[in-house]
Amino acid sequence: MPDHSHIYIGSAFVAGVVLTIAFKDLFYPEIEERIRDYRARHSSKSYQNASVDSLAVRHGPPAIVDGIEGCIGNTPLLRIKSLSEATGCEILAKAEFLNGAGQSSKDRVALSMIELAEERGLMTPHSGDTIYEGTSGSTGISLATLARAKGYLAHICMPSDQAIEKSNLLLKLGAIVDRVPPAPIVEKDNFVNRARALAQAHTNSTASESSVGTASQRGRGYFADQFENEANWRAHYNGTGPEIYAQCNGSLDAFVAGAGTGGTISGVALYLKPRIPNMTVVVADPQGSGLYNRVRYGVMFDTKEKEGTRRRRQVDTIVEGIGINRVTANFEAGRELVDDAVRVTDAQALAMARWLVEKDGIFAGSSSAVNCFAAVKTALKLGPGHRIVTMLSDSGSRHLSRFWAKAGNVGGAVDTKLEDVLNAKEDQ
């Protein structure tokens, strides 16, 4: 019986091998071809879906963009590790110095103002039209860069007490630059009023010369008017706000930013507040500015404006780009959504700028230092476990001759404590 079993098993094995070979020869080529086709089709679909999915979740622009203006927006949101560890909160900063045209948050504003003017027929590329603007520097740099890219000229008016490297850069970009003595907004020689008057004179002279057949000055003059132009806050409503919301997955407790024109704080607040009603919006205000009292007490006033004093600068601070002593349309657009304000002295801004270099390797501009100081104060007020977002508006490279000249060099062996920053005092 066992021998018969062995014979049976062996015969069955041989028969199986023969049948397998026969089946392979008869049917396998067709099956193999079908399998190859199936795999090819589904592999292609998987690759296409993966490509679409990966692009959908990327934080950043497409791999290839059209011109320098395509490099604006979609900036990273970085965690400032030292401040997060020191406060127990997550302090995040929008790296606006990575915008690709003028390397500041003003790239968004400049592009928005130009596009709105084009839509309204106020400017035409390559027609000789000139953009005029009154600015402390960053908006002018962004406008000058984009003007060249889009076929315009730029004429920038700025206070003469701003860092010289800003006007030098504007000249390298081909802009005409007027450095005018600081003056109140009510005076015609104020840098904003001068830009407005020059734009109007340009347009009027072009029209007059056209009627008599001369053309010494081509095109029209367009006054960008960043303080009152709604394209300012809309740039942040359409760009900065949605980016922050997406990068935070809709979860943040406070947004902190300085205000000069007011476009950033208003645009971001107008976008985020309806979606995150319980979040806090905080203005970071340098010394000499009246916005702190405007938010806290409803009155635009600073103690440095008391009767019998006359300040050399519009806002008595070494901080550039934020702080103001008048109401602007852009700030008023979102003022009711602003919950609080933090006053930051020059000494505190300088100490924070040095801290960011020492602890994080972040070389921040003056307004960015003010923002980060106010973010820390907000974090300490809210308590551990909260998420605060602020802005790194531009780098320190535009503040070398003034703000960073005062801040000095950061030594290699320095070990600053956060208390030193919070309690920083002016040198006597």
Swiss-Prot record:
It catalyses: O-acetyl-L-serine + hydrogen sulfide = L-cysteine + acetate. The chain crosses the membrane at residues 7-27. Its EC number is 2.5.1.47. InterPro entries: Cys_Synth/Cystath_Beta-Synth, TrpB-like_PALP, TrpB-like_PALP_sf. It holds the Pfam family PALP. The modification N6-(pyridoxal phosphate)lysine is found at K106. Its cofactor is pyridoxal 5'-phosphate. Belongs to the cysteine synthase/cystathionine beta-synthase family. GO terms for cellular component: cytoplasm; mitochondrial outer membrane. It is an enzyme of class 2 (transferase). This is Cysteine synthase 2. CDD domains: CBS_like. Putative cysteine synthase that catalyzes the conversion of O-acetyl-L-serine (OAS) into cysteine, the last step in the cysteine biosynthesis pathway. However, in contrast to cysteine synthase cysB, this CS-like protein seems not to function in cysteine biosynthesis. Pyridoxal 5'-phosphate binds at G260, T261, G262, G263, T264, S367.
